[in-house]
Amino acid sequence: MIDDNIENNEQTINDIAEDIVETANPEITELKAEIEELKDKLIRTTAEIDNTRKRLEKARDEAKDYAIATFAKELLNVSDNLSRALAHKPANSDIEVTNIIAGVQMTKDELDKIFHKHHIEEIKPEIGSMFDYNLHNAISQIEHPDHAPNSIITLMQSGYKIRDRLLRPATVQVVKKSE
């Protein structure tokens, strides 16, 4: 009889254990699914935060570059004037004039370094290259038998850009089609 009671108790314990496992299995499955869903959300949120950080860094860099655009435009004329002064230096001059020219050259070189530091590039099209309305401003057209139509024949003034943004187009003369 005791053995029967023990067997009955063991059976009851086994039945209770099975009931617990059956009851717990859906909960465990549900919890596992919830864990997977939370892991997926974490991965997506982390990626979204990373993308947002990259977008903000890019926007900050662009804002920094383009914030100086107005100031840089005003400096372009200074650079042009220094270049003109250097282009017209006398061939034979005394020491004082030579020193002044050296000072002008150093100033121009320093300005060019600052332009380079802030990604300001000179647009200086080659004679014979094709006119690009995105980078050039044609102030006149002339006929020329040795050059193709719409090619640049004269560079009047260099242009400048900051990265991809145009500060000032290069001023040019272009060849027009012969009539």
Curated annotation (Swiss-Prot):
Participates actively in the response to hyperosmotic and heat shock by preventing the aggregation of stress-denatured proteins, in association with DnaK and GrpE. It is the nucleotide exchange factor for DnaK and may function as a thermosensor. Unfolded proteins bind initially to DnaJ; upon interaction with the DnaJ-bound protein, DnaK hydrolyzes its bound ATP, resulting in the formation of a stable complex. GrpE releases ADP from DnaK; ATP binding to DnaK triggers the release of the substrate protein, thus completing the reaction cycle. It is found in: Cytoplasm. This is Protein GrpE. The gene is grpE. Its main location: cytoplasm. It comes from Rickettsia felis (strain ATCC VR-1525 / URRWXCal2) (Rickettsia azadi). CDD domains: GrpE. It comes from the Bacteria. Belongs to the GrpE family.
